[in-house]
A protein has these predicted regions:
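Active-site pocket-lining/capping segments in soluble small-molecule metabolic enzymes
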Residues: 1-98, 116-120, 125-171
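Conserved nucleotide-cofactor-binding alpha/beta core module
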Residues: 100-102
């Protein structure tokens, strides 16, 4: 019932054919026309200069068009979005490495609507988080499984000079 997309910046799939601004705005309209939701990724680590000079202008057109949620990794981005777009729902990315109840509760306290749990968790661990928090829970059940904990990668950078934390995973 929802579509997940990456835009032209700050997504963990830097080498993918991501949406341009025009395409993403059209996608928001199209998805809403069919009664569905669109969630956009901002799931990399941002530098201070990027937060101050780029993130607001990047998110603003999508926010105005009715973006349903932003998926974030960086707690600085979470704080920034909460401050500048207070009614925009935020989802904590699997890249945020939420591995337990306390992490999920902390995200809940920060106003996060949904936690995408770490891919490395068992079904029982995910169930425990769901039973002890009030946030929506989402989990990956297939796909890539990183050598490191998701969102904590230094391996790609070490081996290939490409930062997985900036969307350039060597996987």
């Amino acid at each position: 019932d929802s579509v997940y997309v990456g835009g032209s910046m700050f997504g963990a799939r830097a080498y993918a054919n991501n949406f341009s601004e025009e395409e993403l705005l059209e996608a928001i309209d199209y998805v809403h026309l069919h009664g569905k939701k669109l969630f956009m990724t901002v799931n990399t680590l941002l530098k201070e200069q990027e937060l101050e000079e780029k993130l607001y202008a990047y998110l603003l057109p999508y926010y105005k068009r009715g973006l349903d949620a932003v998926i974030v990794q960086d707690v600085g981005v979470l704080r920034f979005v909460r401050k500048h777009f207070p009614d925009l729902p935020i989802h904590a990315s699997t890249q945020m490495t939420i591995t337990g109840i306390d992490g999920a509760k902390f995200m809940e306290e920060q106003g996060v609507q949904r936690v995408v749990t770490s891919r490395e968790l068992s079904m029982k661990e995910v169930q425990q988080i769901a039973e002890h928090t009030n946030v929506e829970i989402e989990s990956f059940v297939h796909g890539a499984l990183c050598y490191c904990y998701s969102g904590q990668c230094l391996f790609s950078s070490f081996l290939g000079g490409r930062s997985g934390n900036r969307g350039q995973c060597a996987q």
